[in-house]
């Protein structure tokens, strides 16, 4: 089956009900853990598959224990990263991996699950191996341009790999790789109200550091705030919960928030966003058509955030700077120049829009239906 035919079939099948001989709902296990970039797309898919019985595979004490909706029973296993070099620690990791595989196999078998959907990351390794051992279909979604280690190593065990960026297909030599975009939370697809006392016709800068925050960006930004507010900007700064200096600066036009419940409203209102370059945040910037300044996290695995950011830079959707090259003076100047040029911001907005796949959640749900109906 060719790539085009495969994509056509999965889109056509989305509106079909999941069919079983017993008329019981299809049971699907979703393996997604760790960060918002892994969890939010998986939650979007789960919410789209209302005719399925869905349960979740996660890790204790990770973000999923707080974010996963209560209607999805949560199973937990212990997983950890793979070592770069062979040694005694590698053997320990492999031993624990085998234990995790056996536990996932037990969950899948006892629960009589009919398939696995995963968004990659370390939890995907034992989940994929266990599912394939039992002969169950596996759908893997990779949101980053440069696929993670687990995706690269285990994609051939999957029935299909869906990628969030079209550029990502060239890094996977696997014929059943399809570009479907990355699903976003439903609120990003509809107008949201911002419940902060900000006047309507003022420029708004939003600073975010991903679901974990970014102390380095916070420190950089705080040195620029006085000049920005002096030039009329209002600033919403989501600092994350690990910044000891989060509330060190106060100004009526500056809102400091460790966490904000409705990121969609922030991005929709923002004239400019300053952010890391995680795939989840970039997808949200694309669907809200929001101009951005991106500062890729320099210690991300395989420098994958730089690959994500390059796509936005190539489409004129963002300005991209490394953390090392960006001084407070440079950031201050770049932001003020953008805010003073509606033409530049409009061009960046159109660039972001060109990268959006707003129906990704429907396409990916269609893919799940297609694979599990065979």
Curated annotation (Swiss-Prot):
Give the membrane topology: Peripheral membrane protein
Task: Mention any Pfam family matching this sequence.
Answer: Glyco_tran_28_C
Predominant place of localization? membrane
Where along the chain is UDP-N-acetyl-alpha-D-glucosamine bound?
35-37, 144, 185, 211, 305
**Would you say which domain of life the source belongs to?**
Bacteria
Q: What's the EC number here? A: 2.4.1.227
Q: Quote one Gene Ontology molecular function term.
A: UDP-N-acetyl-D-glucosamine:N-acetylmuramoyl-L-alanyl-D-glutamyl-meso-2,6-diaminopimelyl-D-alanyl-D-alanine-diphosphoundecaprenol 4-beta-N-acetylglucosaminlytransferase activity
GO BP: any one term: regulation of cell shape
- Report the catalytic activity: di-trans,octa-cis-undecaprenyl diphospho-N-acetyl-alpha-D-muramoyl-L-alanyl-D-glutamyl-meso-2,6-diaminopimeloyl-D-alanyl-D-alanine + UDP-N-acetyl-alpha-D-glucosamine = di-trans,octa-cis-undecaprenyl diphospho-[N-acetyl-alpha-D-glucosaminyl-(1->4)]-N-acetyl-alpha-D-muramoyl-L-alanyl-D-glutamyl-meso-2,6-diaminopimeloyl-D-alanyl-D-alanine + UDP + H(+)
Which Gene Ontology cellular-component terms appear in the entry? plasma membrane
Q: Which InterPro entries is this protein grouped with? A: GlcNAc_MurG (IPR006009), Glyco_trans_28_C (IPR007235), GlycoTrans_28_N (IPR004276)
Which terms are listed as keywords in the entry? Cell cycle, Cell division, Cell inner membrane, Cell membrane, Cell shape, Cell wall biogenesis/degradation, Glycosyltransferase, Membrane, Peptidoglycan synthesis, Transferase
**Cellular localisation:** Cell inner membrane
- Pathway, per record: Cell wall biogenesis; peptidoglycan biosynthesis
- What is this protein for, i.e. what is its function? Cell wall formation. Catalyzes the transfer of a GlcNAc subunit on undecaprenyl-pyrophosphoryl-MurNAc-pentapeptide (lipid intermediate I) to form undecaprenyl-pyrophosphoryl-MurNAc-(pentapeptide)GlcNAc (lipid intermediate II).
Q: Which family does it belong to?
A: Belongs to the glycosyltransferase 28 family. MurG subfamily.
The protein's name: UDP-N-acetylglucosamine--N-acetylmuramyl-(pentapeptide) pyrophosphoryl-undecaprenol N-acetylglucosamine transferase
Organism the protein comes from: Trichodesmium erythraeum (strain IMS101)
Provide the taxonomic classification.
Answer: Bacteria, Bacillati, Cyanobacteriota, Cyanophyceae, Oscillatoriophycideae
